[in-house]
Amino acid sequence: MATVKKVLPRRLVGLATLRAVSTSSVGTFPKQVKIVEVGPRDGLQNEKNIVPTPVKIKLIDMLSEAGLPVVEATSFVSPKWVPQMADHAEVLKGIQKFPGVNYPVLTPNFKGFQAAVAAGAKEVAIFGAASELFTKKNINCSIDESLQRFDEILKAARAAGISVRGYVSCVLGCPYEGKISPAKVAEVTKKLYSMGCYEISLGDTIGVGTPGAMKDMLSAVLQEVPVTALAVHCHDTYGQALANTLTALQMGVSVMDSSVAGLGGCPYAQGASGNLATEDLVYMLAGLGIHTGVNLQKLLEAGAFICQALNRRTNSKVAQATCKL
């Protein structure tokens, strides 16, 4: 297993405390934000070389140690489609279960849901999309048909007391359709919420969104679904992830998805690399005086560990500025 080198300068300790400067506008933001760390699943699923199971387990444990309240651990998808996630059961069983930390797993179908439950999953996630063409190309059915396929999962989850999180892809743009109507995003989000998803993450899958587009989309969705049930999942393909996240914060959204070291993208959307780096998100939120419960120093150590294991450079600007990776 790769080992962590001591690459984090101690001067970062003072930086990481980020004595938040209060501003007159802070009152417009939530006082606390829940960060959903998607690196171990969304971040690693597209890596060409198979990441050893012990490395995945250590990464998840380090992220938990850093104080992240939610760490999406893996995906119970067919190894034929995503070979990187073939060790899903071993990962879920092998990680330390930190008190107060949730470890949701992606379940694309009922077979995956059953396997996840057998491995000890307490929360699962399902995926929808706001683009008909994206849905057709990925799973060869319509949006409505795709949601109907999840009905069995939601019913079984309800009976077993398992929480279900929903994802909506392509909320600000599609690689095939282009611009997506905010009304369509609102429609799909409302359906997932009415089906029983306690939280719906709105994903800018190809990272084309701007703050204006984010505002328009959320304005439509908030007419159908309470803000407490929403999260945003921004990609930094065009360098807009933090700006879009800030816009969502201003509109009351208090759950943010991000990936350590900015790992990951979407395997079906060409050029859609670059999830929002968790390190950069934590740095911004700390500067706004918004509580996350995340220790930036330990988070940076987790990012350094996985980047060294993958033999790659971090995509986090904060890590680049302080760790020299």
Curated annotation (Swiss-Prot):
A motif (Microbody targeting signal) lies at residues 323-325. It is an enzyme of class 4 (lyase). It comes from the Eukaryota. Its EC number is 4.1.3.4. InterPro entries: Aldolase_TIM, HMG_CoA_lyase_AS, HMGL, PYR_CT. It is found in: Mitochondrion matrix; Peroxisome. The modification N6-acetyllysine is found at K48, K111, K137, K179, K324. Gene3D superfamilies: Aldolase class I. Keywords: Acetylation, Disulfide bond, Lipid metabolism, Lyase, Metal-binding, Mitochondrion, Peroxisome, Transit peptide. The active site is at C266. Pathway: Metabolic intermediate metabolism; (S)-3-hydroxy-3-methylglutaryl-CoA degradation; acetoacetate from (S)-3-hydroxy-3-methylglutaryl-CoA: step 1/1. Substrate binds at R41. The modification N6-succinyllysine is found at K48, K137, K179. It catalyses: (3S)-3-hydroxy-3-methylglutaryl-CoA = acetoacetate + acetyl-CoA. GO terms for molecular function: hydroxymethylglutaryl-CoA lyase activity; magnesium ion binding; manganese ion binding; metal ion binding; structural molecule activity. Residues 33-300 form the Pyruvate carboxyltransferase domain. Residues 1-27 form a transit peptide. Homodimer; disulfide-linked. Can also form homotetramers. Mitochondrial 3-hydroxy-3-methylglutaryl-CoA lyase that catalyzes a cation-dependent cleavage of (S)-3-hydroxy-3-methylglutaryl-CoA into acetyl-CoA and acetoacetate, a key step in ketogenesis. Terminal step in leucine catabolism. Ketone bodies (beta-hydroxybutyrate, acetoacetate and acetone) are essential as an alternative source of energy to glucose, as lipid precursors and as regulators of metabolism. This is Hydroxymethylglutaryl-CoA lyase, mitochondrial. It comes from Bos taurus.
